């Protein structure tokens, strides 16, 4: 799919698929936070989810 965002000022950002192993530690941590938040907001799993330490 096309993962491109365009701003009103004409700037654009395009996301490309990458292997998760190639992400930096900071990128992995942020991805984990986003996934955790989405699980809580979008799904009623009926169980407690905790972030690994």
Curated annotation (Swiss-Prot):
Record's subcellular location: Cytoplasm
Main location group: cytoplasm
GO cellular component terms given for this protein: cytoplasm
InterPro entries membership: RHOGAP6/36
Keywords: Cytoplasm, GTPase activation
Any one Gene Ontology molecular-function term assigned to this protein's record: GTPase activator activity
Cysteine disulfide partners in this protein: none
Free-text function comment from the UniProt entry: GTPase activator for the Rho-type GTPases by converting them to an inactive GDP-bound state. Could regulate the interactions of signaling molecules with the actin cytoskeleton. Promotes continuous elongation of cytoplasmic processes during cell motility and simultaneous retraction of the cell body changing the cell morphology.
Protein name: Rho GTPase-activating protein 6
Natural source organism: Takifugu rubripes (Japanese pufferfish)
Underlying gene: arhgap6
């Amino acid at each position: 799919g096309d993962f491109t965002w365009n701003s009103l000022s004409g700037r654009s950002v395009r996301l490309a698929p990458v292997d998760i192993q190639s992400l930096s530690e900071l990128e992995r941590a942020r991805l984990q936070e986003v996934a955790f938040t989405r699980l809580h907001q979008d799904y009623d799993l009926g169980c407690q989810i905790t972030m690994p330490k």
